[in-house]
């Protein structure tokens, strides 16, 4: 079994180099990997972080969420398009950092509710 630590306990910007000492400490404590919150996708920054995590010997997975500005199930086509574009950047950031897994929820924005019950097609 492998044991990892979710970095959301400390930060929502894991690519910030100020957190490198924390990552080294987690490795020294015996953690096999870390789970990265990717809320501000930036493949270039995450590629740099990936190289640093390789040097530390830490494996990585990632998580993200959608918000109202990039809700994949919004009735507004421009918001759905923004969701698609953002999720592409998240996936690119995962690839750049060397993440083996991306978790969500990815299907809808956090905290967005229509207030309507399920339709017959949804039920």
What is each stretch, according to the model?
Residues 77-123:
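Active-site acidic/histidine proton-transfer and metal-coordination neighborhood
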Residues 1-4, 53:
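N-terminal amphipathic alpha-helix/helix-capping segment at the start of soluble metabolic enzymes
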Residues 6-8, 33-35, 74-76, 119-120:
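A short, structure-level motif marking secondary-structure boundaries and short turns
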Residues 3-7, 32-36, 60-65, 102-104:
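Hydrophobic faces of well-ordered beta-strands that scaffold small-molecule active sites
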Residues 21-28, 43-64, 89-99:
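Acidic (Asp/Glu)-rich catalytic clusters
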């Amino acid at each position: 079994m492998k044991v990892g630590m979710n970095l959301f306990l400390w930060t929502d910007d894991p690519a910030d180099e100020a957190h490198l000492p924390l990552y080294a400490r987690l490795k020294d404590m015996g953690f096999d990997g870390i789970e990265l919150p990717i809320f501000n996708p930036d493949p270039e920054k995450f590629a740099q972080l990936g190289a640093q995590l390789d040097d530390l010997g830490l494996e990585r997975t990632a998580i993200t969420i959608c918000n109202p500005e990039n809700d994949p199930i919004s009735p507004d086509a421009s918001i759905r398009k923004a969701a698609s574009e953002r999720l592409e950047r998240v996936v690119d950031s995962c690839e750049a950092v060397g993440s083996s897994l991306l978790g969500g929820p990815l299907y809808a924005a956090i905290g967005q509710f229509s207030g309507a019950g399920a339709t017959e097609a949804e039920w």
